[in-house]
Amino acid sequence: MKQNILFYLIALLFFPLYEMQAAHQPEFSTAGFYELANSGREVYSMNPAWRFHKGAATGAEATDFNDRNWKMVSLPDGIEYVPTEASGCINYQGEVWYRKHFTPADELKGKKLFLHFEAIMGKSKVFVNGNLLTEHFGGYLPVVVDVTDALNWETDNVIAVWADNSNDPSYPPCKAQDVLDYTYFGGIYRDCWLIAHRPVFITDPNFENEMAGGGLFVSYDKVSDTSAEIILKAHIRNDSKKNFKGVVEYELQQPDGTQAAFLNDVIQVRPGKAVTSKDKIMLKSPLLWSPETPTLYNLIVRIRDNEGNVVDGYRRRIGIRSVEFKGKDGFWLNGKPYPSPLIGANRHQDFAVVGNAVANSIHWRDAKKLRDAGMKVIRNAHCPQDPAFMDACDELGLFVIVNTPGWQFWNDAPEFAQRVYSDIRNLVRRDRNHPCVWLWEPILNETWYPADFAQNTLDIVNQEYPYPYCYSGCDSEARGHEVYPVLFTHPANADKDWAIKSLDPKITYFTREWGDNVDDWNSHNSPSRVARNWGEQAMLIQAQHYAAPRYPFTCYDVLCRTPRQHVGGCLWHSFDHQRGYHPDPFYGGVMDVFRQPKYAYYMFKAQRSPEKQDRLFETGPMVHIAHEMTPFSPKDVTVYSNCDEVRLTYNKGGKTWTYTKPATKEGMPSPVITFKDIYDFMIDKNMSMRKKKQDEVFLLAEGIIDGKVVATHEVRPARRPEKLLLWVDNENTDLKADGSDFVTVVAAIADKNGNIKRLNNYYVKFHVEGEGRILGGANILANPAPVKWGTAPVLIQSTLKPGKIKITASVLFEGSQMPASAVLELESKPAAHPFIYTESEAALIPMSSDSPFGQSAAKSASELEQERLLKERNAQRLKEVEKQQADFGEKK
């Protein structure tokens, strides 16, 4: 381990901090905190280099078990890579084993050492050096293990994890995957950390199992623009053999580092005991958190002994806000009525190829893309999601409905309910300090549970969060819903068969899922369920269905017309995702499994405010033409924009049309704009072939506010496919060299001017050189990858070494007249935390896919230049062919 820590420090010297911060770089918590320098608390990534076996393996917990033939993986790991169409239970369910070899560094001696698995799917057992240290049931919450006395020094240690994602009715969610509307996937699919600190320390709330306690608990009261009370609790344990006397310090810093408050609390902790420090900050003129201004303070907590030495400490990002649900008066934020319905979407975290084994950066990018689209609330479907996603929502201003795991299943066995109750307690303990938490949803999704269960779950949330601004929601159809302050239902101004029949003035209402519209719950045909590659017509219908269909239905427009008592709704669903009980994925996302946008995404974007602000997410005016100018494109041209006016121009010197937004304040902020009977392919043909004015054919939309053009979007017909384009979809975030992080690189088929050719059926093969690897191979159609709606994405993962990565993309079957290859170079940056692994083990991590068909040779600069010159020569030769075809073709 020593040499790996040294490499980490050397890397920081070669990649200075200022280079890493050219753009905003998100940071992610570890076990609920952010590391604080010189605190005596260190965080090590345990993600690299685990040996993996799919299936049963008798005796695999033993230190001397022979695992030399096992596959080498790094965490997060989802057991297997899957195709983009991975529904219908094609994924593996069953036992798996992981084994990690390492030798702990001497500097860890004498410290408390905790293994923190953010989640392990299914039921699991954790062994260290052959000893069973813990057993866990459930796949979405932390598994924390005290390994202080389990390690051996100056020799090889083995952590062995057994996990099983098989159908099991004894713990939630419990529903068998073949009758489940999502997919469990499997493995150790989130991060694993080793937390090291001194024997006097701030505890982990998910390890301590103390009601409304353990760790750090930050809550608020009397929040307003002028002042706020910040209620502080810190649970301190003394595992040393001496009495401890000292202080707990709380330092509150504004985002710019300015100290906003400081106080301390004297503590005394006897050996083997724990105490809770309680204090309160009275803050004047607080910078309040909201979706529009998600201001985060840094709360630094330190334990000092009587000599002033720092014994333990860490940093926590907090947002000061109040949330109140006031029945007929609706939702109030920070002491004021919130001015509009909160509209957002549900989110499963699964991603193309990797399933649920998603890198932290992807969680941040997901949140960023949703916030860019103007969404303000996300419902975690149907489980606590990765801590990295919660961190991102804090930073980007997304409210979150936090769900306990559960979906249409109840088991009368007492152990089942107890495990549900345990999950609720642990999700509150894990997420209680996040300002993004809007509602707790402790009931089981769409489940016929006993009536007393609803009361019990509400009581548990209130026990675990006994402070102001804590609210829970429940389905209006569920047994026992009467005790809940927030009920989920459809609004009365939509489909009246779905809406609640009478409103209680004391209750606040919200639509937890809207937008899906199946013909029946077996076929699952719906105008909302549209694969991106089905093209313009299908995507236009989906976007209109979500915006304002011509039939009674809960849609964006309807939700904007509700009384204050109905406070918004979450679309089902943000992204396409995999399912167990149906052969088709859910295609109803506004983005696909790679997070490539459909037209509906831009419809959502058009609903955000046109006011430009300095934020981490996109703000300001926008305009988007939902039309590709193909021979099959509709005559009507659809545009999405949040501007007051939109001017559409068809061709250079051609006609223009102007749309003016209605003055009414009712309904969705920006209705879908349709310019009727505009596009004509024959006009394109006439301009292009007969008049030789291809460059003058286009659609141009200009967004206008106060008479000024503030946003534009131009679309041109894609001509002959000439080349590939490559770009990285990273939201300007760095690729971290931690062996786990990955980024989406997109190849597109384009004409000579870079216009994407949406209609083609090529395959693209990728080759990577340097410090990166491709995730997935030909066996799952990841590499080579089919081109869908003009693009073929691939996932590029970092290695453990920062450095350059070169990606080459070519069409699978190359020829002198096929599109030219493209090259893209990336550079991975140093990881945020040092690693623990054995060098010889890490060297066995595969650098390429195990599918030989997916391997393409790298192209040298000279080969690429030859390709370019050949394309130029061919273009000249083709001009003669084109002329002769024109001479013998139609003249009129």
Regions found by a protein language model. Give the residues of each.
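Accessory beta-strand-rich segments of carbohydrate-active enzymes
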Residues: 28, 32-36, 56, 93-209, ...
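Substrate-binding clefts and catalytic carboxylate motifs of secreted carbohydrate-active enzymes
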Residues: 41-64, 80, 120, 180, ...
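Short glycine/proline/serine/threonine-rich loop/turn segments at secondary-structure transition edges
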Residues: 108-111, 151-156, 243, 283-296, ...
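Short, hydrophobic beta-strand segments
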Residues: 147, 278-288, 672-694, 783-800
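Extended acidic/polar, glycine-enriched regions
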Residues: 152-156, 233-326, 824-826
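Beta-strand-rich structural segments
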Residues: 232-236, 302, 637-641, 727, ...
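Substrate-binding/catalytic cleft of secreted carbohydrate-active enzymes
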Residues: 364-369, 377-600, 621-626
